[in-house]
Structures are given as C-alpha cells and as structure tokens.
Design a protein with these regions (language model features):
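Preference for short coil/turn "hinge" residues that link or interrupt alpha-helices
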Residues: 16, 27-28, 43, 100-103
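A solvent-exposed, acidic/Ser-Thr-rich amphipathic alpha-helical stretch
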Residues: 29-78
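Alpha-helix C-capping/helix-to-loop hinge sites
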Residues: 22, 41-42, 88
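Short, low-complexity N-terminal intrinsically disordered segments enriched in polar/charged residues
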Residues: 1-29, 33, 126-131
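A beta-strand edge to alpha-helix "cap/lid" segment located at domain peripheries
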Residues: 2-7, 57-131
Length: 131
C-alpha cells in the first residue's frame, strides 16, 4: 500500500515531462500549476536560490534570449525525478540536468546542474538570493 501523498513513478515522470513541456510552450499558468506554493529552485553553479512559485514563474518568464528546452531523458521514482535536457539559447546548445523533489503531486524543489560554470545574467537580482 502506498502512503498518503505519495505518487507513482509514472506520475512523477509525467509531472517532470509536463514541467519541460510547459516551459517550452511558455504556458506560465500551466507551469505554475505544477509547482508548490513554496517551491525552491537552486542553481549550485551560480549560487542562486529562488523561493516561491510566483518568483520562479517570473524568473522563467523573464529569462533573456531565445531559449528552448528539449527533453532527452525523463526518470521518476517517487518522490524524485530527473530530467536530462538539451538547452538551446540563441542558437547555442548544451546538455544539462535537473533534479526534482515531488510532494502531493506538485514539484517542491528543482536543482539545475549545468556542464560549465557561468555567471548569472543580469536583471534577476530581485528574484534570487545568493548563497
């Protein structure tokens, strides 16, 4: 028997797939519906952390450039998911990975890892805290 609030591996994979799909379509309402109110987004390489659904949605909506997210591999095993994706920004492409924590059918934490260190783009200081 599955404890209350737990999801199946298929449900976690579906949630992670929907995350990538709604980002790519820029469907901010649907994207926000996948996130917990108190979602935490972390970028270890830039030492940035964003807390809360509204800030995380805005962070993505305001992200500069012509960017695209193409899933390569989606894994899920409650309460965790993983997305290997091709990130394309202004014509340049790279692989990256995101790890997800899921609780009660919503994403509560996202950690993005990139192949190279980088400095965050300017103009998002109002949304992030630096570690």
């Amino acid at each position: 028997m599955r404890p209350a609030g737990r999801a199946t591996a298929d449900a976690v994979r579906s949630l992670v797939s929907a995350f990538a799909d709604t980002l790519e379509r820029r469907d901010w309402t649907a994207f926000g519906a996948l996130l917990a109110d108190d979602v935490v987004y972390e970028l270890p390489q830039t030492r940035e952390r964003i807390r809360g659904r509204a800030r995380y949605v805005r962070f993505n909506a305001e992200y500069p450039g012509d960017w695209h997210v193409q899933p390569v591999l989606v894994l899920g095993d409650d309460p965790n998911g993983c997305l290997l994706f091709r990130w394309t920004l202004d014509g340049e492409s790279m692989l990256a990975v995101a790890f997800f924590e899921v609780r009660e059918a919503v994403i509560v934490k996202v950690t993005d890892l990139w192949p190279e260190p980088y400095e965050p783009p300017p103009g998002r200081e109002h949304l992030v805290e630096r570690a």
